[in-house]
Regions:
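Transmembrane beta-barrel wall of Gram-negative outer-membrane proteins
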Residues: 277-288
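Glycine- and aspartate-rich repeat motifs characteristic of hemolysin/RTX-like Ca2+-binding segments
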Residues: 98, 287, 371
Length: 603
């Protein structure tokens, strides 16, 4: 019998699959006991993962012992089926880190040769902070194999469509334009990511910064507290990726309990992650971590819509993983063009379950429109369940971009979002999506932008919004906005009506406004409303109606069983929500079973 959490909104079970491989070949890698002349046996292991790659054919498991592996793993074989997979995993109970970073062992000198003030300033020759201590050094050219992240800009350098302009020209303001022009490489001093600046003189404004010269080799650095280089451990991203198949379309790869760190990759498109499926399908990724990606944490699709492929797609399971400190997006994917028009292509059967997304999307370039802790395009028959998202810098928590169908978003916790849309964002879809049993707390507006919503959609229909908790949203708790889209964005030749935003038994409080619906054809009942900071907190886009609960009920028949309530809450260390409704208190473990705990409120 299928577990109820794997039932899709249309009532069918999710296409769940597992690794049933009986691994006949097992290879071992060990930094402590391995050697470059090893044979990969348990007694004579390899020193590097790369040594195991040529032998890792279908039916092979590569067991990696504890250590820090400074390499990119590039498999040359995929698996054939659930019974013939290729697996890379950490040895049981051991910590394995695969990193794109190298330790800097070069020589520092006093920095010189660059103007210390902005170019137009006359008669001032020192930094704004004259006490600033700036040093210069050069990376080892031999550390960069194939690409040098410090020699490439963030970008993106590809057009989204086949066209004349790459998306870097979406940069709306000076902040955006500086960000896209920065280099992809990152520096880490004593484990802390340093801030890169575009101009040398900016080193004199703040410590813990660095500047890269045009050669991508020479760098100038100001250590924290204007300290000297001695006594610090400095790491630099010599590689973009941690795990990236040598060829496209590999399937049935299993990754387990591996940590990938410090990838100096670029901004999408292309969506090329520190872990990349490289257009593959049927990957099982469990218990893995991606920490510190300059651009993309992991990609599970075809990277950009300019690709053309009729190869299989989707069917990825991402379970119990963590994606943290990723600059643009933690986990993302999209379909490719094929013999079907691009907008009618789909990404089928994706499961993202029990994952953590912490402090992502720190690059302030939201107009790129690919920014989220988790973002997918054209997702079908998929589950996004029981994930924990906290700290989203300039983005949404979960963003499903256009023509999604039969999607369940359930049991997710989303905290502390700053963005143009909301904690959960659904876009341009006219078929069934269910948003149920989620908690969104503290959603704020990106500076000079819209946003600050809990659950947000635009240009959609047929979204079921059920038993969610939305608190402390700077704009709306729940908003389903509607407006016309161009004809070319009509999936399967059909536009969007803005109907059927069925909204039941949600708890919304401490927001400017409570609920907005696209048009009037909806079913709405049983919602519990609390504090709102603006009048007429219940609204409809077209025809426009701004209402209180009394007239919401009277004129539209909404929320016959809904009510206003005295609601207060306390968020304790982002782990517990103490929610009080009309004097009754509920202690919700934000790391526990969210659906069951919310159902208790309505029991």
């Amino acid at each position: 019998m299928v577990d109820s959490k794997y039932i899709l909104p249309n009532g069918n079970p999710y296409d769940l699959w597992e690794d049933h491989t009986q691994y006949k070949t097992v290879l071992y890698v060990s930094q402590k006991n391995g050697s470059l002349t090893g044979d990969g046996s348990e007694k004579n292991p390899f020193l590097t993962i790369a040594q195991a790659v040529p032998l890792a054919k279908p039916g092979t498991k590569v067991i990696i012992h504890e250590g820090i592996y400074r390499e990119t793993v590039r498999p040359i074989y995929g698996g054939n089926s659930e019974t013939e997979m290729v697996m890379f995993c950490a040895a049981e109970g051991e910590q394995v880190e695969i990193t794109g970073a190298e330790i800097f062992n070069g020589t520092f000198r006093d920095s010189e040769g660059w103007k210390k003030q902005e170019g137009s300033i006359r008669n001032r020759y020192d930094f704004d902070q004259p006490e600033a201590k700036v040093y210069a050094a050069k990376f080892d050219r031999n550390a960069f194999i194939g690409t040098n992240p410090f020699g490439a800009i963030n970008g993106p350098v590809l057009p989204w469509w086949n066209g004349p302009v790459p998306k870097l020209f979406n940069a709306k303001n000076e902040t955006n334009r500086q960000i896209v022009s920065l280099r992809r490489g990152m520096l880490f001093c004593d484990g802390e990511r340093m801030e890169q600046v575009l101009n040398y003189y900016q080193l004199g404004e703040k410590d813990n910064r660095f500047f890269i010269e045009d050669d991508g080799i020479t760098f100038h650095i100001r250590f924290k507290g204007d300290s000297a280089p001695e006594g610090h451990t400095l790491e630099y991203t010599a590689r973009e990726y941690g795990f990236y198949p040598e060829e496209k379309y590999f399937a049935y790869i299993h990754l387990q309990n591996l940590t990938f760190t410090k990838g100096g990759n670029g901004f999408p498109p292309p969506q090329a992650g520190v872990i990349s499926t490289n257009c593959g399908h049927h990957w099982l990724v469990e218990g893995c971590k991606v920490l510190y990606a300059n651009g993309v944490g992991m990609d599970i699709g075809f990277q950009c819509p300019n690709r053309f492929s009729t190869e299989p797609r989707g069917h990825h399971i991402i379970r119990g993983c963590e994606f943290s400190y990723c600059g643009i997006v933690g986990l993302t994917g999209m379909p490719a063009n094929s013999e079907t028009f691009y907008l009618d292509n789909i990404m089928p059967s994706i499961l993202v379950e029990d994952c953590r997304f912490i402090d992502n999307c720190y690059h302030n370039f939201e107009s790129l429109c690919e920014n989220a802790a988790f973002k997918m395009h054209r997702l079908h028959d998929s589950l996004i369940i029981n994930n924990y998202i906290s700290g989203v810098g300039y983005a949404s928590g979960i963003w499903l971009d256009s023509f999604n169908e039969n999607i369940l978003i359930e049991g997710n916790v989303i905290l502390h979002v700053v963005g143009t849309y909301g904690g959960i964002f659904l876009e341009a879809s006219n078929d069934l999506q269910t948003v149920r049993h989620n908690i969104v707390i503290d959603s704020r507006i990106n500076t000079n932008e819209n946003g600050g919503n809990g659950i947000y959609s635009h240009t959609c229909e047929d979204i079921k919004t059920i038993r969610n908790i939305c608190l402390e949203c700077e704009k709306y708790g729940i908003v389903h906005h509607w407006h016309d889209l161009p004809e070319w964005r009509s999936p399967g030749g059909s536009g969007f009506c803005g109907f059927n935003f069925d909204t039941f038994e949600n708890i919304v409080s401490h927001c400017d406004y409570l609920v907005m619906l696209g048009r009037e054809k909806n079913e709405v009942d049983g919602n519990i409303y609390g504090v709102h900071r603006q009048p007429a907190p219940l609204r409809i886009v077209q025809p426009r109606a701004w209402l209180d609960l009394k007239h919401w009920q009277k004129n539209y028949g909404y929320d016959v069983n809904g009510r206003m309530a005295d609601i207060s809450y306390e968020l304790q260390e982002d782990k517990r929500l103490i929610l009080t409704i009309d004097g009754k208190t509920f202690d919700i473990d934000l790391l526990g079973n969210i659906p069951a705990q919310i159902d208790q409120i309505f029991a």
